[in-house]
Amino acid sequence: WFTPKILGGLVKEIKKTGMAVTLSCGEMPKEAYAYLRECGADRYLLKHETADPEIYSALHPDSSLQQRIACLKVLKRLGYETGSGFMIGLPGQTAETLADDLLLLQEIGCDMAGMGPFIPHPDTPLRELSSGSTETTKRVVALARILLPKLNLPATTSLGVLSGSEKNDVFSCGANVVMRKVTPTKYKRYYEIYPAKLGETHVIEDRKLLEQQITALERVPR
């Protein structure tokens, strides 16, 4: 339903406020990416999920890793701040796979990357699997910071779901971006990607809590 033309109109309206616009609309033709960029989109997030072609095909039987990488390279050439990322703890994943994930980020020239532990959802075919390791996740984030010192590395939502009060530890490992959900409460149930409590959304209060969290980490909110 959200065609490039409709998305472009939304981007133009949002840009009138002076805010930067980040899109995450999946794989699209080059022409669509170019049009949205012309409309003012600044960034695009398209996670590659895994650099292992066999694991990727098992998770995305109707797509291919090669196509996903091609889209990321197009986004980079069009001048988007390009974000990707991958899950940690997927079935069949190895240390070598994770190393390939990091090298792929370097090859593409990503500006941002989200790295979070895999969390099985009870309504999916992977529901019987175990979650990814939070410790491995933090180590991979640390390696990413060493390999790509200018990369923006968010503390992912999935890591917060699994690690609870320890979620801020990842900032000592190299993460430098905080993301806060502001989805209106009535819409949250339509985007339950993790089996966690949805909670209420209170934007003003949440902003204050976020600023307190950042200050407690001896960072400056901006």
Model-flagged regions — what are they?
Residues 106-222:
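Auxiliary Fe-S-binding modules of radical SAM enzymes
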Residues 2-4, 34-36, 56-59, 95-98, ...:
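Short secondary-structure transition/capping segments
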